Amino acid sequence: MQRLMMLLATSGACLGLLAVAAVAAAGANPAQRDTHSLLPTHRRQKRDWIWNQMHIDEEKNTSLPHHVGKIKSSVSRKNAKYLLKGEYVGKVFRVDAETGDVFAIERLDRENISEYHLTAVIVDKDTGENLETPSSFTIKVHDVNDNWPVFTHRLFNASVPESSAVGTSVISVTAVDADDPTVGDHASVMYQILKGKEYFAIDNSGRIITITKSLDREKQARYEIVVEARDAQGLRGDSGTATVLVTLQDINDNFPFFTQTKYTFVVPEDTRVGTSVGSLFVEDPDEPQNRMTKYSILRGDYQDAFTIETNPAHNEGIIKPMKPLDYEYIQQYSFIVEATDPTIDLRYMSPPAGNRAQVIINITDVDEPPIFQQPFYHFQLKENQKKPLIGTVLAMDPDAARHSIGYSIRRTSDKGQFFRVTKKGDIYNEKELDREVYPWYNLTVEAKELDSTGTPTGKESIVQVHIEVLDENDNAPEFAKPYQPKVCENAVHGQLVLQISAIDKDITPRNVKFKFILNTENNFTLTDNHDNTANITVKYGQFDREHTKVHFLPVVISDNGMPSRTGTSTLTVAVCKCNEQGEFTFCEDMAAQVGVSIQAVVAILLCILTITVITLLIFLRRRLRKQARAHGKSVPEIHEQLVTYDEEGGGEMDTTSYDVSVLNSVRRGGAKPPRPALDARPSLYAQVQKPPRHAPGAHGGPGEMAAMIEVKKDEADHDGDGPPYDTLHIYGYEGSESIAESLSSLGTDSSDSDVDYDFLNDWGPRFKMLAELYGSDPREELLY
């Protein structure tokens, strides 16, 4: 078999060499080949071009121009001229017009343009007419291996999990060779790692893989790989290398360990359950997202006393009490804690020795408030009992001092004023309780810590006390609702008037039975239905409205409680007129049906009369006091309250009070003593020497009044012991040239001097003041 295979390979090689030789021979003289292939036969052929494409190698090293090929027709003419048309004519190619030879006038690069499409034209030199139809042809540029591979990026970034298995793909890089991939190995690329080959390898496809499983992010987080690309002939250049940066992805492959072996905390005993009392810190080389530390208490008797929660933000362990701390019970807690990571497979890794630590928690004493023995109290009490012991609450001081405790009921409690609590915590009711009024009472009892003197220390606790009032059969049955029965005056025997039912304010059991009895003899019959209802029917029939319009039926209702209670409820039955169909046509008004009692009417009238008498007494008392004050005033006091209405200005200043004793003394000539003042000394104006009186026939004028005022003013100004007199009033002069003249009562010397006012004395005591004011001649009584 081996010999057969070798024979076949040798035969194939020989055939290949023969084919290459044939191609070379054909290409050595293409023009000649074309010419021979297109020689005319015995029959006449149409003239036509004898070529279709040309070939040339890129980047020839010979001098320009480079001969590409030759264009010619099957029929030669001496006056023929060859032309080229196309985009690259004159720039890249030209043609010899006489011979048809095509030349490249610049070096060609296949990587830029691999084919050129031109048009060949043959024309007559003289006329310029086309001798042949223009023909398009192609010039193909043959590739040579003149380019080296170039990476698509100079820098690649990749990542791979740490501790990955050997052969794990990291990244694929690509380098591109611009040469023709169809020609030999011109475009084939080969890769190799120049830097980082200790940890990574690359295959010919550009895929980089790991060759070791000892990649540890905690030791080295990044790796730099330099990759080289070259073609099959070994062409390399500056662009033939690239850098790959490989970042190791962290995995949770490290156990946490404590930063110290012993933690000590001091915690007050009043620390609330669930609050932090301390924190435990560990180190974990992994990245934060892979730090999943779990803390647990290993040894000790206090596993149920504390819990350790993990704070994800800082990976710390927060110690929290699970039940209240009590210094009087335990002063110190000591236990061992362990920090582990449950996501790490313990089959491949074992935790380090530093993942355990000792925790010591010292409890400090705090003055705590009293503690009740129960979270709440529930007591029961029968209603209508007179101040029995309801129950006892008890609180104790949890501290070692064991202070005494005082109790009180908060006044904000529900009806707390009905109860009291003693120093021992006994609760009593202050009044009888009625379940039908309040079936439940909710009290808040305070327990206050007292010092040796009995003064509260400020520490207090409260507890809720629920008092349930138990029912007794202390209420008689009554109608279930108000009834307003009616009956026709022509009602017949046995006619149903009303069905009644009863209720009881007490708690009624399911077997409660009410018994109904009609207690009086009348025209009605009561029939007990034995289902807690009863029927009222007409006994004889035919009522007389003229005699009785309303009938009162006292119904006695009793229950079967222990003891039994009996009550009487009255039905007010109105006798109405009815038509033939038995429909009510006229009944008495509601007031008559209800039948307001005489006692109620008398009570209402007495209330109205009492209110009226009280109102009259108040009015008369105020009036008598007003009259007493009016009659008890002296003449100067009356003068002090007189208001003059002929002043044209001043507003309310006209009613300013002033001491009129001075004017009175002037008017009386000093004979009448002035009104006593608080000061024993007489008024300043009473001490002033008065001007001499005028003759009886003389008349005082404004000038004399002004002179007197000036004298008084000077004396007041020079009197250092007297109070200032800042307000001066002139009443005798009210202006000049007034048509109505003066209306003032003080200026009557010129208007009513001849009027006799003695008749005022005959008008009685009500005009006594006017008689004193006007009963004498003003010119003799007053001095202006």
UniProtKB/Swiss-Prot annotation:
One of its GO terms (molecular function) is beta-catenin binding. It comes from the Eukaryota. Residues 48-151, 152-258, 259-372, 373-477, 478-593 form the Cadherin domain. Glycans are attached at residues 61, 112, 157, 362, 442, 523, 535. The chain crosses the membrane at residues 600-620. Residues 1-25 form the signal peptide. It is a single-pass type I membrane protein. Residues 621-784 are cytoplasmic. GO terms for biological process: adherens junction organization; bicellular tight junction assembly; blood vessel endothelial cell migration; blood vessel maturation; calcium-dependent cell-cell adhesion via plasma membrane cell adhesion molecules; cell migration; cell migration involved in sprouting angiogenesis; cell morphogenesis. Residues 26-47 form a propeptide. Expressed in endothelial cells (at protein level). Expressed in the brain. Keywords: Calcium, Cell adhesion, Cell junction, Cell membrane, Cleavage on pair of basic residues, Cytoplasm, Glycoprotein, Membrane, Metal-binding, Phosphoprotein, Repeat, Signal, Transmembrane, Transmembrane helix. Residues 48-599 are extracellular. Ca(2+) 2 binds at residues 58, 111, 143-144, 146, 179. Ca(2+) 3 binds at residues 145, 147, 177, 179, 186, 231. Phosphorylated on tyrosine residues by KDR/VEGFR-2. Dephosphorylated by PTPRB. O-glycosylated. Its main location: other. Three calcium ions are usually bound at the interface of each cadherin domain and rigidify the connections, imparting a strong curvature to the full-length ectodomain. Cadherins are calcium-dependent cell adhesion proteins. They preferentially interact with themselves in a homophilic manner in connecting cells; cadherins may thus contribute to the sorting of heterogeneous cell types. This cadherin may play a important role in endothelial cell biology through control of the cohesion and organization of the intercellular junctions. It associates with alpha-catenin forming a link to the cytoskeleton. Plays a role in coupling actin fibers to cell junctions in endothelial cells, via acting as a cell junctional complex anchor for AMOTL2 and MAGI1. This is Cadherin-5. It comes from Homo sapiens.
